[in-house]
Amino acid sequence: MADIRITGRMVNFTRLTFDTNDHDAIRQQLTSILNEGSYQGTVVILDSTVEQELIALIQLLISLGLQPMAVIDGILSDEAKAIQFPVLPADQPLQRIKASKEEITVIATPKAADTTPETKTPITKTAIAHKTSYHDEILRTGQCLVQDHGDIILNAGMNSGSEVIASGNIHIYGNVRGRIIAGAGGNPSARIFCHALEAELVSIAGTYCVAEDIPKDVLKKSVHIYLNDNQELEFRALEF
């Protein structure tokens, strides 16, 4: 019987539930699971039925190419709070909503092998390059806006308890009081731009900052957030 259960996705997070604290067994089982599916770079939420050495577990998951983002409120909560690792409420899944509009950028890539002797002209095929989701309404508590293949532009604010998650950049032209997660899947060049920063959590490519650690000099200001050369979050106030 497996000691790790992958019970599905919470938005675009995968929830891992551990029934063992034997990290050798966890490594062995997860390696097998990861080899069978496309989980590389996946953002994961941690739950456990047994006590864990949380820091060691997080390091183990990172070494396997996963991105631990938070724990579910429960056995792991106290240890997570002690290291300022995010804790999510138990059994309160968010409602994934549809963006007001989605724009798809496509490119034509030459397929050199498919040429004809008469013309020697490469046959082209169309591939999706990038998507941008536009949303014009306030993101309410319990709602989540997700773009797995590009950027999000939110032309309104977001309430506490809401989430915006993009594999690329995030632009929010309003108050940010929820959780903003850019570069989901491991894109370190992703950036966040927001009109008024009061976020509960900020993350780019798995590097996160909880509300208490956001620099006080950028709170409620227009901010540009990115990863520096040391893969640390930088918060730059925008002057207009």
Curated annotation (Swiss-Prot):
GO terms under biological process: cell morphogenesis; division septum assembly; regulation of cell division; regulation of cell septum assembly
- Pfam families registered for this protein in UniProt: MinC_C, MinC_N
Question: Which UniProt keywords are given for this protein, alphabetically ordered?
Answer: Cell cycle, Cell division, Septation
Sorted alphabetically, which SUPFAM superfamilies does this protein's record hold? Cell-division inhibitor MinC, C-terminal domain (SSF63848)
Q: Where does the record locate the signal sequence feature? A: none
Quaternary form? Interacts with MinD and FtsZ.
Function, as annotated, reads: Cell division inhibitor that blocks the formation of polar Z ring septums. Rapidly oscillates between the poles of the cell to destabilize FtsZ filaments that have formed before they mature into polar Z rings. Prevents FtsZ polymerization.
Assigned protein family: Belongs to the MinC family.
What is this protein identified as?
Probable septum site-determining protein MinC
Q: Report which gene this protein is encoded by.
A: minC
